[in-house]
Amino acid sequence: SPDVSVSTNLGSWINRKGLFSRKDTSDIFKDRKIPSAQKWIFSPDGQHIELGIAEMNLFIMLGSAGLSHELFNERLFPIGTVYDSFIARGLDALNYACYQDARFIIVGTPSGVSLAPEGGAHQSIGTPLTGISQPGLLSFEPAFADELSIILNYSFNYLQDENGGSVYIRLS
């Protein structure tokens, strides 16, 4: 994720799965006795790659990991999350990734105007057009959790399908 993991509700997942790093690194917040709900422990076993606020880097990484089958004959299932309104910050890399037939899932959350109190830049009223217009990107906007479950199941199969592609899911 290239954005604030707490406000995108990734905190508990990160705490369970850990942060990826090539070497073990202790939690600097804990070491300095700074209160935090997050466990910022990095290790080679971690499954979350923290990118800071860098949407372009997210799409470059998703595109690269999404080409693993072509490059190494081993399919990965890269999933990225981003503030939905910030999808546009990485459109060049998203466009190239889709045209190269990279396979990944991008989740834009929260979508719509739910972040309106944070200002106009946080309202994602134009991003549905990205999902609709980008070749190689299938777009969904589920309203209920049971829909999301079915969409994710379909998406993992779609990523592996010879005629498949990448998937964009907008969540509110």
Show the residue positions of the predicted features.
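Thiamine diphosphate
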Residues: 1-172
